Amino acid sequence: MAPITLSTVDDDLKEVIQHLFEIQSAVHGYLGPETQTELVRKIKNLTLALSTLSTHTKPQPPSQDEEQKEKQDDTPEGSANDPLLRDIQLPPEIIDYVDAARNPDIYTREFVELVQRGNQDLKGKKEAFASFRDVLAREMRSAMPECRGEVERVLAATGGARVDTEQ
């Protein structure tokens, strides 16, 4: 069986949605026994579509033959635009958001804001340590002139402010 791609599952979902819409329309226009066979047919089609979707989304470990083939081929089976279903990893938090009928974009926005706050904290710490490094180097140069060369070497290695050694 060929590997299942995201577009295959997407098509299966669209088909299920289409069948549900058709059933909704048939139920809305139900006229009795004369439309019953059509409704039964549409329900059977929905059942088949759901069965296909279920089959396509079952996790299937790759067989040894497929693993050997993947090792031999340098090209991936799925393209960047249509990845294999088994390669898609969703964070459990996003799944929880969807299960709770919340918008996953809210999770993404909150996550980005959290990362930005963390980056700002780290930037502040980096600047504080750089300032401390420069103050410490200046004080060490003035207090221990014999260590001036080592201080300059450490400053150069850590990206600190360089001071002329000829004074």
UniProtKB/Swiss-Prot annotation:
Coiled coil: none annotated. It is found in: Nucleus. InterPro entries: Mediator_Med10. Its main location: nucleus. GO terms for molecular function: transcription coregulator activity. One of its GO terms (biological process) is regulation of transcription by RNA polymerase II. Keywords: Activator, Nucleus, Transcription, Transcription regulation. Residues 53-88 are annotated as: Disordered. Component of the Mediator complex. Belongs to the Mediator complex subunit 10 family. This is Mediator of RNA polymerase II transcription subunit 10. The lineage of its organism: Eukaryota, Fungi, Dikarya, Ascomycota, Pezizomycotina. The gene is nut2.
